[in-house]
Amino acid sequence: MKTLLKSIKITLVFCVFFSVFYILVLWLFAQVAGPNRGNAEVVTLNGKVVGAANVGQTFTEEKYFWGRPSCAGDGYDATSSAGSNKGPTNPEYLAEVEARIDTFLIHHPYLARKDVPAEMVTASASGLDPDITPQSAYVQVKRVAQARGMDVEEVRRVVDKAVEKPLLGIFGTEKVNVLKLNIALEELKNR
């Protein structure tokens, strides 16, 4: 009986620790050290809120850069954040990826199949990834420039400015926030 009571006490202590104290410590750390104090980075255009930089959005128009596909609900639904849970050998998953590659190539006919970045046809684990690699942005430059009637080099320079370096130069990889990149293009158009 003593062992059972000890086990129950230890379980309760760990439940309280991990469900309250640990979460509180992480939240406090984010408030002190995290970018935007651990809160959403709201993005505005012409004084109107258009999204959050840390949650991906669906862009489908030719004039915008596209992010990664999402498996979160009906496209970037933060309440349904999750991957598809389909493995890389699952026939349904392989068919989805093949269909995404075909669609990507229709909109980027200047690319060879082997040049389609994997991240542009596979969803992230959360389904809410707001960033793409610089490579994934650069392969879209020609399409976006044509759709906007802009010079390819001008759009490339916008992408160059949008590339974010790894945190402290060592944590993570270079990335491009798709929403911020599209906002930069809209602001360029409004000048």
Swiss-Prot record:
It comes from the Bacteria. Pfam families: KdpC. Part of the high-affinity ATP-driven potassium transport (or Kdp) system, which catalyzes the hydrolysis of ATP coupled with the electrogenic transport of potassium into the cytoplasm. This subunit acts as a catalytic chaperone that increases the ATP-binding affinity of the ATP-hydrolyzing subunit KdpB by the formation of a transient KdpB/KdpC/ATP ternary complex. The keyword Acetylation does not apply. It is a single-pass membrane protein. InterPro entries: KdpC. Belongs to the KdpC family. Keywords: ATP-binding, Cell inner membrane, Cell membrane, Ion transport, Membrane, Nucleotide-binding, Potassium, Potassium transport, Transmembrane, Transmembrane helix, Transport. It is found in: Cell inner membrane. Disulfide bonds: none annotated. This is Potassium-transporting ATPase KdpC subunit. The system is composed of three essential subunits: KdpA, KdpB and KdpC. The chain crosses the membrane at residues 10-30. The gene is kdpC. The keyword Nucleotide-binding applies. GO terms for molecular function: ATP binding; P-type potassium transmembrane transporter activity. GO terms for cellular component: plasma membrane.
